[in-house]
């Protein structure tokens, strides 16, 4: 396996891609990371490099993220539309570079939102779409999140959390603006605490996660951290004010969704409701047990197996 790192000029922005390749004959798999602003190449390299036997695996540090982060980025407004445009330019570049008509896209979390929107708009470039931790609607997801932490707090007899949750109650209405008392940040902390981000039985942990990043990026870790802050600050308000993918009811390419059974960052029940109504040439929803939002790194053997099955 060859590992290549290079900068590509995308929409007048130098963006870095890491490629794991064994043969130019293999189909291209573009990994679209989550966050926003959280490049995943250290974990993909560690846990998913097996895929390079059958795919040319490309990890993209998105605009404002990882090695692609630059202070010059602040001169241009960071929008979801710009990120989609970047993704299109990168896809066209990769297809030309590897002489392919189409490629595979695997998006995780925020990357699954970006990836699915891209596939919906530009199906002519995509052979197969894989969404891991597929968020549906920021607001609808929040209802499932609240119910999850409330039930877990009861199971674990977490009295302090129960009192806090009951003090502001479940989200109601149709948007965050109608719920000024609701504390999404607190609910998010409980999801982490209760195993909805990384499952308690997983060999992956937050400590090992961060150590992998430091070992991989070395001194560039400071650039990575700056990019995370920049991307979250600029993109999260746009993401949270949208319905994400609820308007997508039909795809022209096959789709595979993969979720950890315990994922409540992007709740599995919400994804299933949307998925059942989706029309696509072929569709499959794989749920992996004893895993949560980071299922692609918590249960890499099972996740990799799903990716290899669609070839």
Enumerate the language-model features and the residues they cover.
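Conserved alpha/beta-hydrolase
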Residues: 51-70
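Short beta-strand/loop motif that positions the catalytic acidic residue
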Residues: 251, 257-259, 263
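A catalytic-pocket lid/entrance helix-loop region that shapes and gates access to the active site
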Residues: 126-172
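Conserved hydrolase catalytic core segment
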Residues: 100-143
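Catalytic histidine-centered segment of alpha/beta-hydrolase-like enzymes
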Residues: 291-300, 304
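Conserved acidic catalytic loop of the alpha/beta-hydrolase fold
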Residues: 82-102, 117
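Alpha/beta-hydrolase
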Residues: 159-246, 253
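The serine-hydrolase catalytic nucleophile loop
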Residues: 36-48
């Amino acid at each position: 396996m060859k590992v290549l790192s290079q900068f590509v000029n995308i929409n007048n922005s130098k963006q870095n891609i890491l490629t794991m390749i064994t043969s130019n004959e293999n189909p291209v798999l573009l990994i679209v990371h989550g966050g926003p602003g959280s490049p995943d190449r250290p974990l993909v390299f560690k846990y998913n490099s097996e895929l390079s036997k059958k795919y040319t695996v490309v990890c993209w540090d998105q605009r404002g993220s990882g090695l692609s982060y630059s202070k010059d980025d602040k001169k241009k407004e960071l929008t979801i539309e710009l990120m989609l445009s970047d993704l299109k330019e990168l896809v066209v570049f990769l297809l030309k570079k590897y002489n392919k008509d189409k490629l595979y896209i695997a998006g995780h979390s925020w990357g699954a939102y970006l990836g699915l929107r891209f596939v919906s708009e530009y199906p002519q470039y995509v052979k197969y779409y894989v969404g891991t931790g597929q968020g549906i609607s920021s607001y609808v997801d929040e209802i499932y999140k609240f119910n999850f932490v409330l039930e877990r707090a009861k199971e674990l007899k977490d009295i302090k959390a129960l009192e806090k949750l009951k003090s502001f109650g479940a989200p109601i209405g149709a948007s965050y603006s109608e719920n000024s008392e609701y504390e999404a940040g607190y609910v998010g902390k409980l999801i982490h605490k209760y195993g909805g981000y990384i499952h308690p039985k997983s060999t992956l942990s937050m400590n090992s996660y961060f150590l992998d990043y430091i070992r991989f990026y070395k001194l560039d870790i400071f650039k990575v951290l700056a990019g995370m802050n920049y991307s979250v600050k600029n993109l999260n308000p746009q993401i949270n004010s949208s319905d994400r993918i609820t308007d997508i009811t039909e795809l022209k390419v096959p789709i595979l969704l993969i979720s950890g059974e315990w994922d409540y960052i992007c709740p599995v029940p919400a994804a299933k409701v949307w998925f059942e109504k989706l029309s696509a040439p072929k569709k499959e929803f794989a749920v992996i047990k004893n895993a949560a939002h980071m299922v692609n790194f918590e249960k890499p053997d099972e996740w990799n197996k799903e990716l290899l099955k669609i070839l």
